[in-house]
Amino acid sequence: MMDWLYRYPPLYPGILLKRYKRFFADVQLTSGEIVTAHCPNTGPMTGVSTPQSAVQLSKSDNLNRKLAYTLELIQVHDNEPTWVGINTFLPNRVVKLALAKYLFPELGEYSQIKGEVVYGLDKKSRVDFFLTGSDEERPIYLEVKNTTLSEGRLALFPDTETTRGQKHLRELMALLPLTRAVMLYFINRGDCTEFSPGDRTDPVYGKLLRDAIALGLEVLPCRFDISPEGIRYLGLAKLKI
């Protein structure tokens, strides 16, 4: 099996009591202590915030932090018991590591990786990654989307209406065909083998994605194995459009 792309720091198991005000989660640790952890996910976390679920927390030694613990993983039982990554700051870090290891052959050859490059019609957006290679190769604008919603083995994005995500699609479409535009869906759970746009949660996004694909947008629905030990890349999910 492929080596770990990312290893978690020591994690503390517990049971989720409730998540509230987006940024807070009350968790009972195995010791019985109840702590309030930071929830690094501003989305609705549909299907991945059920009370009484097993969770894993990291702990910071920074005494200036108001909350020492951070919610990192939650276990779901939609299929077999599966850990789901909650921390939305991790996908970009993991993708950067994967890009450095050239784990996505679909991207072809590139020699430079830049992050947070300004682009867009109003020059007010930043693309997650900008890849360049030889003069003969078109540059690649690559956007990463954290994906946790599922129906059975089917991963879905988004899990709620996302005007920001719609804007990103429109801006990537505007780059075509002079550059390559790639949408990488980071499937933050190992039990999904297929990917589709979440038409029920955001039909506008689904239509935009299909329109973008017709214009040449490339889609990489990337599967990742998530565990308290770390994160591994599993390859591409089947794209169902």
From Swiss-Prot:
Q: Name the cystine pairs.
A: none
List the Pfam families hit by this protein, alphabetically: SfsA, SfsA_N
Q: Molecular function terms in GO for this entry?
A: DNA binding
Gene3D superfamilies in the record = 2.40.50.580, 3.40.1350.60
Q: Which InterPro entries match?
A: SfsA, SfsA_C, SfsA_N
The UniProt family comment states: Belongs to the SfsA family.
What protein does this entry describe?
A: Sugar fermentation stimulation protein homolog
Which organism is this entry from? Answer: Nostoc punctiforme (strain ATCC 29133 / PCC 73102)
Q: Which gene encodes it?
A: sfsA
